[in-house]
Amino acid sequence: MSATHHKTPLPQGVRLGTVMRIRGVVPDQAGRFHVNLLCGEEQEADAALHFNPRLDTSEVVFNTKQQGKWGREERGTGIPFQRGQPFEVLIITTEEGFKTVIGDDEYLHFHHRMPSSNVRSVEVGGDVQLHSVKIF
């Protein structure tokens, strides 16, 4: 299985109320995939949000990366993704953080560790068949 790598630039950044909608399918042999909200275009940009469904360990990990160092991991409850199934994830910018909604259910509200106004791109990668990334 070949890994996906897709980046959507956000030259205006994100603001309160910005919604990012990611749609795709989890392949049958999927291990992990990620959605990163990056604070730049460069390879080692800080990540205001690292959203990382890990089907191989049945968990979803949230984190940030600042100056090349990962922060403290947070985990959601259960894994709302299934191999071979389509999914829709909404990441909504709120005053407190990034609210993730998977399907119709709020999953986890990840509190800001750096200003959301620093976000300049959305990166999706790993074991995923990406259908679309839309910004509202």
Swiss-Prot record:
UniProt source species: Rattus norvegicus
Organism domain of life: Eukaryota
Pfam families, per the entry: Gal-bind_lectin (PF00337)
BP GO terms, sorted: apoptotic process
Database matches in PANTHER family: GALECTIN, GALECTIN-7
Subcellular location, record wording: Cytoplasm; Nucleus; Secreted
Assembly notes: Monomer.
Chain's gene name: Lgals7
GO MF annotation: an example: carbohydrate binding
Name by which UniProt lists this protein: Galectin-7
Amino-acid positions noted as binding a beta-D-galactoside in the UniProt annotation, renumbered to this chain: W70, G71, R72, E73, E74, R75, G76
Record lineage: Eukaryota, Metazoa, Chordata, Craniata, Vertebrata
Purpose: Could be involved in cell-cell and/or cell-matrix interactions necessary for normal growth control. Pro-apoptotic protein that functions intracellularly upstream of JNK activation and cytochrome c release.
